[in-house]
């Protein structure tokens, strides 16, 4: 993927341990890099909190992220805390083989980073595009591990809230992994209170379409 002036350069080191090798992907709220964990000598994926339109950076001069407008500073800090909360949520399920592992997380460069296991494979969205139709028995075999992982997540009082083909990774050996816990919430924390609306049309349950829909397993 083509890099730009706000993506960290190849060779950049973070906390003296992780080296940036390139950009894997970019979204509205962050940049994901291919990195090397120098301590364990293995590839990792490094997700950087970088909400476009709120922050900027020119890597020709510095690696530090700058909030574009003073009035956005509070929103940026709240967003960064939610990002770190995502890391803590993922870390709770590091022993579950059906969930992408969060290996480390930290703050530096006036932003935050999540270090995750690096996975070779494609998203379920890409898989479905390439394979088009999947036999029911094959689909069940594919999804049972995901359902078991969701059962574990729910048993800990959490809901993912963003289950969709683009948040599920299919590995070369056929195993799948659930990704992206940015919308996850502890439903026991809210009791009968409603949660914010987060959904993907066609995949979200009916209660997520409602402002006061009670969410939970």
Task: State the predicted function of each range.
Residues 146-158:
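Protein kinase catalytic-loop region centered on the HRD/HxD motif
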